[in-house]
């Protein structure tokens, strides 16, 4: 609920959400339903309905440019994180999810890899630095500009 409130109060242009995901090499985790992610192999970039494609691609380009290792994970209808709240409130905030792979989630012996923690921080830092002032990731801005261009090329009957 906090993420939805934030969108109303500060009206962000972009939301890069961080959370954790399962290290699926952990015993009793089903790779068929959870995907394949492991600690020590980098942050996990999510593909999901709430994740804005243009922003996600910027994050991937940033990781590749800065040689930050990363993994990919597909989510179904919901990510189960604040990404959903940002994406579907206040007219839709361009949102992305970068997760930290975690072994033994919700136990007293949770484990992460130090390199993954550092790479999550680097990836967010470099991505934020790549953003331009008032840059829009909105699908609507792109389609609106294309529609305007089409109209200018072919304004219809005179």
PLM feature spans:
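Acidic/histidine-rich catalytic neighborhood of metal-dependent amide-processing enzymes
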Residues: 1-42, 83, 135, 139
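Active-site-adjacent substrate-binding region
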Residues: 35-121, 127-143, 147
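Short, intrinsically disordered C-terminal tails of secreted or membrane-associated proteins
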Residues: 152-157
């Amino acid at each position: 609920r906090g993420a939805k409130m934030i969108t109303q109060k500060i009206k962000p242009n972009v939301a890069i959400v961080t959370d954790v995901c399962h290290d699926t090499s952990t015993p009793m985790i089903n790779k068929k339903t959870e995907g394949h992610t492991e600690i020590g192999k980098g942050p996990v970039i999510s593909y999901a309905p709430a994740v804005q494609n243009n922003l996600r691609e910027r994050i991937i380009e940033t990781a590749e440019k800065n040689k930050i290792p990363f993994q990919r994970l597909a989510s179904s209808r919901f990510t189960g994180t604040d990404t959903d709240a940002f994406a579907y409130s206040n007219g839709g905030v361009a949102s992305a999810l970068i997760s930290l792979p975690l072994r033994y989630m919700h136990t007293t012996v949770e484990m992460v890899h130090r390199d993954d923690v550092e790479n999550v921080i680097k990836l967010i830092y470099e991505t934020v630095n790549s953003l331009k002032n008032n840059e829009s990731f909105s699908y609507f801005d792109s389609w609106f500009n294309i529609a305007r261009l089409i109209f200018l090329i072919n304004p219809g009957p005179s």
